[in-house]
Amino acid sequence: MIHSSVKRWGNSPAVRIPATLMQALNLNIDDEVKIDLVDGKLIIEPVRKEPVFTLAELVNDITPENLHENIDWGEPKDKEVW
């Protein structure tokens, strides 16, 4: 559990969200959030406009039938690392 405090931002109260939580929620500055009061608890949830997939979910449907061939891009150039 992370503790924070209510501060002033202009004329409004504000709570800082630590970077670790922003990363865990895949949130960025200016992303829209939904704020609700449920049973005396302040609930802040990201508003997802597009689905967010994990790498495991994205590769789960890869089969030998739809797997693309490897492409030979040649040798690395300059500072490229392969």
Swiss-Prot record:
The keyword Transport does not apply. One of its GO terms (cellular component) is toxin-antitoxin complex. InterPro entries: Antitox_PemI-like (IPR039052), SpoVT-AbrB_dom (IPR007159), SpoVT-AbrB_sf (IPR037914). Disruption phenotype: Decreased sensitivity to dramatic intracellular increases of ppGpp. Double mazE-mazF disruptions survive high temperature, various DNA-damaging agents and H(2)O(2) exposure better than wild-type cells. They produce more P1 phage than wild-type cells, while introduction of lysogens into a growing non-lysogenic disruption culture is lethal. Double mazE-mazF disruptions show reduced biofilm formation, and survive antibiotic treatment in log phase better than wild-type cells. Changing R8A: Binds poorly to DNA. Transmembrane segments: none annotated. Keywords: DNA-binding, Repressor, Toxin-antitoxin system, Transcription, Transcription regulation. Induction: Expressed in exponentially growing cells. Induction has been reported to occur after amino acid starvation in a ppGpp-independent fashion and to be Lon protease-dependent, but also to not occur after amino acid starvation and to be regulated by ppGpp. MazE alone and in combination with MazF, represses transcription of the mazE-mazF operon. Fis activates transcription. Part of the relA-mazE-mazF-mazG operon, there is also a second mazE-mazF specific promoter which is negatively autoregulated. GO terms for molecular function: double-stranded DNA binding; protein homodimerization activity; protein-containing complex binding; toxin sequestering activity. Degraded by the ClpPA and Lon proteases. SUPFAM superfamilies: AbrB/MazE/MraZ-like (SSF89447). GO terms for biological process: regulation of DNA-templated transcription; regulation of growth; single-species biofilm formation. Residues 4-49 form the SpoVT-AbrB domain. Changing R16A: Does not bind to DNA. Probably forms a homodimer in the absence of MazF; binds DNA as a homodimer. Forms a heterohexamer composed of alternating toxin and antitoxin homodimers MazF(2)-MazE(2)-MazF(2). Antitoxin component of a type II toxin-antitoxin (TA) system. Labile antitoxin that binds to the MazF endoribonuclease toxin and neutralizes its endoribonuclease activity. Is considered to be an 'addiction' molecule as the cell dies in its absence. Toxicity results when the levels of MazE decrease in the cell, leading to mRNA degradation. This effect can be rescued by expression of MazE, but after 6 hours in rich medium the overexpression of MazF leads to programmed cell death. Cell growth and viability are not affected when MazF and MazE are coexpressed. Cell death governed by the MazE-MazF and DinJ-YafQ TA systems seems to play a role in biofilm formation, while MazE-MazF is also implicated in cell death in liquid media. Belongs to the PemI family. This is Antitoxin MazE. It comes from Escherichia coli (strain K12). The gene is mazE.
